[in-house]
């Protein structure tokens, strides 16, 4: 797969996922308080057919999103952070991780 093919494949999702990243950036919720950021990500994944399990490891804003294809193929996982730094905001770039992971998931 070449660079141009990838650009064409992701183009339909770029506006909404960029908007998602911007919303998470604006919220700038610190660790363990990213309630709205978590909801943005899980709502989107739920609409794409993922089963959502919230409160993973007794962390209220942590979640697992599972997409079953039923073909017995391999399983894999992705990790995204979406917390901000207190008083600084998203200087860490975590606002981009969730939307980037979602883009990867859509294309697997």
Regions found by a protein language model. Name each.
Residues 2-103:
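Acidic/His- and Gly-rich active-site-bordering loop/insert found
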Residues 106-108:
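Conserved small/polar residues in nucleotide/adenosyl-binding loops
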């Amino acid at each position: 797969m070449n660079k141009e093919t990838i650009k064409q494949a992701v183009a339909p999702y770029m506006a909404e996922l960029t908007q998602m990243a911007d919303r998470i950036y604006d919220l700038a919720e610190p660790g363990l308080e990213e309630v709205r950021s978590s909801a943005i990500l899980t709502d989107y994944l739920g609409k794409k057919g993922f089963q959502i399990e919230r409160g993973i490891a007794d962390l209220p804003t942590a979640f697992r999103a599972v997409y079953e294809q039923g073909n017995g193929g391999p399983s894999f996982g992705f990790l995204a952070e979406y917390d901000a730094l207190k008083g600084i905001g998203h200087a860490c770039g975590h606002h981009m991780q969730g939307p980037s992971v979602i883009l990867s998931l859509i294309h697997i």
